[in-house]
Amino acid sequence: MEALQALTSRESVSPRHLGGPAPSAAEREAAFKAAMAAPDHGALRPWRFLVVEGEGLHRLGEVFAEAARRANPGADPAVIESAREKALRSPLLIVAAAVVKREGTKIPAIEQIIATGCATQNLLNAFHAQGYGAMLV
């Protein structure tokens, strides 16, 4: 897929419409390589990505269910189950986070957060260019 075609044709795909197979190890590696090429003032690389799949999705579902219980004690069991199932809608989740460095740098926190967003966008674009759907949630 040509670069401009990939950029202009990418759309978010709801987790409800994502299915297997998940990207292979080589496809993931290519996508993470694209993420590493993101604009990054100061070359701090503040982004961190956590890949969740397999049993990890079930454990994450339990975390979602517990969060729903704590947010709404006495919630209908269907609400709790719906929260649990959100983690199981796709074969792979990638959690993106910014680890903001505050000491020893003049780079403002907001620029580090923006760099993480850029890396995440590169990741989404790379998966799209390889034929996969994805959504930032």
Residue ranges and their predicted role:
Residues 17, 96-97:
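Short beta-strand element of the conserved SAM-dependent methyltransferase core
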Residues 56-58, 99-102:
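A short acidic, glycine/proline-enriched capping/turn motif at secondary-structure boundaries
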Residues 35, 94, 100-137:
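Small-aliphatic-rich amphipathic alpha-helix that forms the alpha element of a beta-alpha
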Residues 89, 93-95:
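A structural motif
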Residues 1-89:
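N-terminal amphipathic, basic helical "cap/leader" segment at the start of enzyme domains
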